């Protein structure tokens, strides 16, 4: 069976996204635990201004996701027919769009009622589910060789 091969641009954009999304997601968990916590909190608190850390990851992710989206709808558009590939991009777009619509002081001031914040929380959950679905469908479709093809050049 031939080894799967991925284009270099896809590997770079996917790799950067795969690095930044978990960092943004985990920093968002810390922010949620510190400022909201309606559905639970972490059993510890971390020092620092995590709203700014989370926003920095979002700011780094924004141009990478934009380029990844352009690639996905250009040379990679045939891969979007598989919902396991399309779903994470849609969840990421919702997360970034709703994050851009928020003001960073809302959480510090306890303003949890804004629509943009509710959408951002929804996107946060959807992104976790979408990445899990992405990995499961990838493993079902091509197994470990396909997964490892994103890491090998």
Spans of model-derived segments:
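Membrane-embedded alpha-helical bundles that constitute the cytochrome b-like, heme-associated redox core
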Residues: 1-153
């Amino acid at each position: 069976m031939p080894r799967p091969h991925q284009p270099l641009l896809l590997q770079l954009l996917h790799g950067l996204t795969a690095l930044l999304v978990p960092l943004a997601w985990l920093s968002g968990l810390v922010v949620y635990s510190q400022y909201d916590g309606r559905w639970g909190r972490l059993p510890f608190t971390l020092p620092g201004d995590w709203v700014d850390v989370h926003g920095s990851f979002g700011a780094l992710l924004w141009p990478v996701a934009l380029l990844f989206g352009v690639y996905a709808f250009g040379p990679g558009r045939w891969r979007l027919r598989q919902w396991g590939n399309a779903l994470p991009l849609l969840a990421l777009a919702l997360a970034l769009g709703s994050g851009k619509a928020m003001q960073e002081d809302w959480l510090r001031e306890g303003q949890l009622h804004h629509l943009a914040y509710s959408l951002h929380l929804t996107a946060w959950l959807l992104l976790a589910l979408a990445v899990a679905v992405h990995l499961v469908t990838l493993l079902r479709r091509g197994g470990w060789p396909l997964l490892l093809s994103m890491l090998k050049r």
